[in-house]
């Protein structure tokens, strides 16, 4: 089975409401879809989301990156293509992820297995994802949280910004109003060390499951100090792109957990390397995503079922934020629960 053609197209999906974080705001998910065709008629599909503020890649960069390397993969097997992608291609992590996802999709077809079985999953019982509550005015965020809970969502990821008093206020309000919910707080690098400590001190009587990337990604010393003093688990996100990053954070105890995203690490094969490293060290992870298209989310969901012993939290809620639920998924969402079709 050899690769004979690679095509790309730009896609956009409208969201129910604007998605707001400390880093960006958007009303649509924009991504590049990649189709890789083999000589036996099999087609592998991958996607790359445009999240320039995090990965440095916009739609144009993703398209030109893929175009610059696609001829390298023609007439190669998918195994050969994966090897070439990760050893010979100096392109961004999201562009790389789109090709990696497509190649792995083809390998699962060649093996005649659904993706979760190809990854080694044996337990198909439901998983649970969080849902994101976008950064907004406190009353809007509280209303959004209540609405999410009424729709069966009981794991809430609260996006907060640099205004630490607003963050303290809204997290307390949501936790008080919705005591049945698990609360995850995501600062997206917006806080200083001092404000992070202030937030933690103000959460002594508020049950929080984790704080995600409170300080800027390069500040691993600060992140480590916060992890040491915090009674709330600390999750590293933007600080961890590659296996090398993950090893450093885990081995130097800079955080209690790491967030693995296909768009950060360069695809599903690289995510597996990080998950295997974490599994061998009994270190828990979140499997997360950017705002992404349905095929890349679908791939991550399959992976989540295979590594449920390592993955403490699933943050793959993009389809729940779309204006319309996509038909491309191999899973069904029932509130927070995710089940294979």
UniProtKB/Swiss-Prot annotation:
Binds 1 Mg(2+) ion per subunit. InterPro entries: Dipeptide_epimerase, Enolase-like_C_sf, Enolase-like_N, Enolase_C-like, Mandelate_racemase_C, Mandelate_racemase_N_dom. One of its GO terms (molecular function) is racemase and epimerase activity, acting on amino acids and derivatives. It is an enzyme of class 5 (isomerase). Its cofactor is Mg(2+). Its EC number is 5.1.1.-. Disulfide bonds: none annotated. One of its GO terms (biological process) is peptide metabolic process. Keywords: Isomerase, Magnesium, Metal-binding. Mg(2+) binds at residues 186, 212, 237. Substrate binds at residues 132, 157-159, 261, 315-317. PANTHER family: O-SUCCINYLBENZOATE SYNTHASE, O-SUCCINYLBENZOATE SYNTHASE-RELATED. Part of a large, functionally divergent protein family. Protein modeling and substrate docking was used to predict the substrate specificity, prior to biochemical analysis. Catalyzes the epimerization of dipeptides with L-Glu in the second position. Has epimerase activity with L-Gly-L-Glu, L-Ala-L-Glu, L-Ser-L-Glu, L-Pro-L-Glu, L-Val-L-Glu, L-Met-L-Glu, L-Thr-L-Glu and L-Phe-L-Glu (in vitro). Belongs to the mandelate racemase/muconate lactonizing enzyme family. This is L-amino acid-D/L-Glu epimerase. The lineage of its organism: Bacteria, Pseudomonadati, Campylobacterota, Epsilonproteobacteria, Campylobacterales.
